[in-house]
A protein has these predicted regions:
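Conserved "landmark" site that anchors the functional core of diverse proteins
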Residues: 1-289
């Protein structure tokens, strides 16, 4: 096909196609999905003159390899890994050349963008894979990835030498204290339990994934009754009976019955997403500016 662009040689620890996610389907129980770190993904696209929400490949940690099927430009962002191409800048790739992502050093999710954006089937208006819901699938060795649309490849002018501002590059090993807004049941926790949450250094557990990030630390000793299930959004912080907070992520449930301590600021969801298992994170009350 004229728009075939990359072949998956080795999928590594796993990857999917993701864009900015699907909107308007939560009431039917369909989560938004989409990129875990929209800051990194949008920068990879902008470097190539793509729209910020163009479809990218999202990769977990390390080990993926791709072969170019034709000349094109790519940009890689997000979690830092040893690679045979530089990060955070447009890179020309010739047909037959390989892109190899090796050992991970910081962060959890890496993004591979191609000039024009990746194509593929849409589900409810989005190409974002939601594997648990049978919308799209994880990448497999041998998969052929296509460019969006069928237009001939045209390498954009003036992109060689581009990079992102240094202030936009994040040190994923040292996230800031993440901002939290009040949630509908925040008042149920009272001042003592809320202060405990903000004063505790929490650890991201190995069970954390695209559905939710589970945190370990000194439990919030708060034994509330289960509530009626009600809508939750990406970034909702729920506290189950064991006192260990769970933060809803992109593939998370659309309703939940645990008390909601707070809502992670949308700009900080990407920061939390890049925290690896075992990494520590702190939170702070968000304030109006």
């Amino acid at each position: 096909m004229a728009n075939e662009v990359l072949r998956v040689v080795d999928r590594g620890l796993g990857g999917t196609l993701q864009d900015q996610g699907r909107r308007g389907w939560r009431k039917y129980g369909v989560p938004p999905s989409g990129v875990m770190d929209d800051h990194a993904a949008s920068w990879a696209n902008r470097l190539l003159d793509n729209s910020a929400g163009a479809t990218v490949v999202e990769l977990l940690l390390q080990g993926a390899k791709f072969e170019a099927l034709r000349n094109t430009w790519v940009a890689i962002s997000g979690a830092e890994v040893d690679a045979n191409v530089p990060f955070w800048r447009p890179v020309p790739v010739k047909a037959g050349e390989r892109i190899e992502l090796r050992q991970n050093h910081s962060g959890r999710w890496t993004y591979l963008a191609v000039e024009g954006g990746f194509g593929g089937p849409e589900f409810f208006g989005s190409r974002s894979a939601y594997v648990r819901g049978a919308m799209g699938s994880a990448l497999a060795d041998g998969d052929v990835l296509v460019k969006q649309g069928g237009k001939p490849f045209q390498l954009p002018d003036g992109i060689a030498g581009r990079t992102i501002p240094s202030l936009e590059r994040r040190d994923y090993n040292h996230p800031p204290a993440l901002k939290v807004w009040p949630a509908p049941q925040s008042e149920l926790f009272g001042r003592r339990h809320s202060e405990h949450f903000f004063e505790t250094t929490w650890t991201v557990t190995p069970e954390s994934d695209r559905v939710g990030y589970r945190l370990a630390g000194t439990p919030i000793e708060f034994p509330p009754d289960r509530l009626l299930s009600e809508p939750v959004r990406v970034g909702t912080i729920q506290v189950p009976e064991n006192g260990m907070p769970i933060v809803t992520m992109r593939d998370g449930p659309t309703v939940g019955g645990y008390p909601k301590l707070g809502m992670l600021d949308p700009s900080d969801v990407s920061w939390l997403a890049q925290c690896r298992p075992g990494q520590q994170v702190r939170f702070q009350p968000a304030r109006e500016t």
